[in-house]
């Protein structure tokens, strides 16, 4: 029974780290990347629609994104949504496609982005710790119901802590890599 709890815990912690990775992909690091626009939603016929559902996003060169809307009438709304996002990028349109030149990051902007990365890292660590708390509560419940012994509880709790340490270390490694990528000129 405690093995089942450990497996569920590992799975949930893995999902938390994957969600953190997706979150970091939206942080701009000076290079064009279609995932920068993943969080951008457009008011499309009255509904907030993810940009990647109403347009194709391509990366023709290292510092350029091209957005080709499937519906040309949405160009104005797409431009507004990108400007409102906190990405610090300005779209230009020729009526058919929207081009976004990704400017080189200033030192100040790099430091802001590092703070954002650290905030996301802390949120991911909190998520992992919440999974640990839930697992420990579940194990205590099993012990209280007599399904596992006190020794099994102690052993399983230690295993959960090892998993927590492992996933927190993964988050730290990913954070350091992203910070290095951002601070690279």
Curated annotation (Swiss-Prot):
Q: Which InterPro entries does UniProt cross-reference here?
A: Ribosome_recyc_fac, Ribosome_recyc_fac_dom, RRF_sf
List GO BP terms, alphabetically. Answer: translational termination
| SUPFAM superfamilies cross-referenced by the UniProt entry | Ribosome recycling factor, RRF (SSF55194)
Cellular localisation: Cytoplasm
Keyword set, alphabetical order: Cytoplasm, Protein biosynthesis
Q: Name one GO cellular component term.
A: cytoplasm
Query: What Gene Ontology molecular function terms does this protein carry?
Result: ribosomal large subunit binding
NCBIfam families (UniProt xref):
frr (TIGR00496)
- Family, per the entry? Belongs to the RRF family.
Q: What does this protein do?
A: Responsible for the release of ribosomes from messenger RNA at the termination of protein biosynthesis. May increase the efficiency of translation by recycling ribosomes from one round of translation to another.
- Protein name from the UniProt record: Ribosome-recycling factor
Q: Which organism is it from?
A: Bacillus pumilus (strain SAFR-032)
């Amino acid at each position: 029974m405690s093995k089942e709890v450990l497996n569920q815990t590992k799975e949930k912690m893995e999902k938390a780290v994957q969600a953190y990775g997706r979150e970091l992909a939206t942080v701009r690091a000076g290079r064009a990347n279609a995932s920068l626009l993943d969080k951008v939603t457009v008011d499309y016929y009255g509904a907030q629609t993810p940009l990647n559902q109403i347009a194709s996003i391509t990366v023709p060169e290292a510092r350029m994104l091209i957005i080709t809307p499937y519906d040309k009438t949405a160009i104005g709304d797409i431009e507004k949504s990108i400007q409102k996002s906190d990405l610090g990028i300005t779209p230009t349109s020729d009526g058919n496609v929207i081009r976004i030149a990704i400017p080189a990051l200033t030192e100040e902007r790099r430091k802001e982005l590092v703070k954002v990365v650290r905030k996301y890292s802390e949120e991911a660590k909190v998520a992992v710790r919440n999974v640990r708390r839930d697992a420990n509560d579940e194990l205590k419940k099993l012990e209280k119901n007599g399904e596992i012994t006190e020794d099994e509880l102690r052993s399983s709790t230690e295993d959960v802590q090892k998993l927590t340490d492992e996933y927190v270390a993964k988050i730290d490694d990913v954070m350091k890599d992203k910070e290095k990528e951002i601070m690279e000129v």
